[in-house]
């Protein structure tokens, strides 16, 4: 299940699939407006070849590409040999993204466990071990990498 913010795209990755019913179900937790855009109209544009249609297509392709890379990264996490390696990979990626040894992942420990395909208590136990080994420190969703060298060894 995914939570979307205002302005997010839903079903964009599936919109070009011909003749199949979407497996995506959307449930709104508050009043919501959805804009349905027919794929053929997006791709064909208008008779004026206006910049708006070009920009819409560019934005759509960019959004789909970002989702692809996020899913690819998550697949790499899930293919890791151990939970420790998955944790190390996730934390190292966040370090590279932020350029800082201290960062917040956002969400709960349960969210992180779900994302990494793990049990929450197993995840908590493993990050506790990593803390004892001087690899990292943490408080709630905020992590600080204490030894980048040790963390990268766990990344593999």
Regions found by a protein language model. Give the residues of each.
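Residue-level signal for pocket-adjacent positions within structured domains
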Residues: 5, 10, 70-73, 98, ...
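A broad, structure-centric signal for solvent-exposed, well-ordered loop/edge residues
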Residues: 10-11, 17, 33-35, 44, ...
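Phosphate-/nucleic-acid-contacting segments
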Residues: 83, 90-156
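Cyclic-nucleotide recognition modules
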Residues: 1-61
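Generic structural "secondary-structure junction" signal
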Residues: 6, 11-12, 16-17, 77, ...
């Amino acid at each position: 299940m995914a939570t979307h913010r205002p302005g997010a795209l839903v079903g964009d990755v599936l919109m070009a699939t011909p003749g199949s019913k979407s497996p995506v179900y959307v449930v709104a937790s508050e009043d919501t407006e959805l804009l349905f855009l027919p794929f053929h109209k997006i791709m064909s544009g208008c008779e004026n070849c206006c910049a708006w249609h070009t920009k819409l297509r560019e934005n759509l392709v960019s959004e789909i590409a970002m989702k692809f890379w996020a899913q690819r990264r998550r697949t790499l996490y899930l293919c890791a040999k151990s939970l420790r390696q998955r944790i190390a990979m996730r934390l190292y990626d966040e370090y590279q993204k932020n350029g800082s040894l201290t960062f917040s992942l956002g969400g709960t420990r349960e969210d992180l466990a779900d994302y990494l395909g793990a049990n929450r208590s197993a995840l908590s136990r493993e990050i506790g071990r990593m803390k004892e080994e001087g690899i990292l420190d943490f408080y709630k969703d905020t992590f600080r990498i204490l030894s980048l060298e040790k963390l990268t060894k766990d990344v593999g």
